[in-house]
């Protein structure tokens, strides 16, 4: 676990991989608090207590850093979706599968509401070196839910083909509006959240 004392180590005290993790963690915290536009490589060096040269050994440029923070943001979303699944019903029934589908959709929207600055960066495409795959992957969590719905007969084979794009677009679009504060007050947003999730079920003819 990374703590503030961890982030104050000198260059020599960090193992190669540890420093990269610390830098991404610091970048993630910064974006969550201050937004994307103020993120910088030299600033991260100051926060983590290492030299700018050490930072540049891990990130060729700002685009590379932003890509890494974007990946970490997607992983925060993935963890929120998995946490929602842990709290959802576990029964291997149609109702259970639908409840789990709704729970991950709700978590996606909550990510936009509660972590709007991370939402802003999570799905931006940056010109950077290839990174390891996102894990946990929000897309894979959605796909697993849709496969379960299909196997239980809640989602037809025909609708399964377009279900990922439709479900993702509906929830992602609403989460984006919520992140910008465009869905009204807390009560109105909660009501609209329920509506969009129910609309996703209807659009995919899940029953």
Task: Report each predicted region and the residues it spans.
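Helix-turn-helix
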Residues: 22, 26, 30-64, 68
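Alpha-helical DNA-contacting segments of helix-turn-helix folds
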Residues: 31, 66-73, 80, 122, ...
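Amphipathic alpha-helical segments used for helix-helix packing
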Residues: 109-129, 176-184
């Amino acid at each position: 676990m990374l703590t503030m004392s961890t982030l104050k180590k000198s260059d020599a005290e960090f193992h190669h991989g540890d420093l990269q993790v610390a830098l991404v963690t610091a970048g993630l915290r910064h974006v969550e608090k201050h937004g994307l536009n103020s993120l910088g490589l030299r600033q991260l060096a100051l926060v983590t207590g290492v030299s700018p040269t050490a930072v540049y050994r891990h990130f060729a440029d700002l685009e590379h850093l932003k890509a890494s923070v974007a990946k970490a943001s997607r992983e925060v979303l993935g963890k929120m979706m998995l946490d929602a699944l842990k709290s959802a019903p576990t029964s291997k029934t149609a109702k259970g599968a639908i409840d789990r589908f709704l729970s991950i959709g709700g978590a996606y929207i909550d990510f936009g509401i509660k972590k709007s600055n991370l939402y802003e960066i999570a799905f931006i495409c940056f010109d950077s070196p290839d990174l390891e795959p996102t894990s946990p992957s929000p897309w894979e969590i959605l796909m697993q839910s849709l496969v379960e719905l299909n196997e239980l007969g809640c989602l037809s084979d025909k609708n399964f083909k377009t279900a990922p794009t439709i479900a993702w677009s509906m929830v992602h679009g609403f989460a984006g509006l919520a992140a910008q504060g465009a869905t009204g007050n807390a009560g109105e947003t909660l009501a609209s959240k329920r509506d969009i999730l129910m609309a996703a079920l209807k659009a995919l003819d899940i029953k």
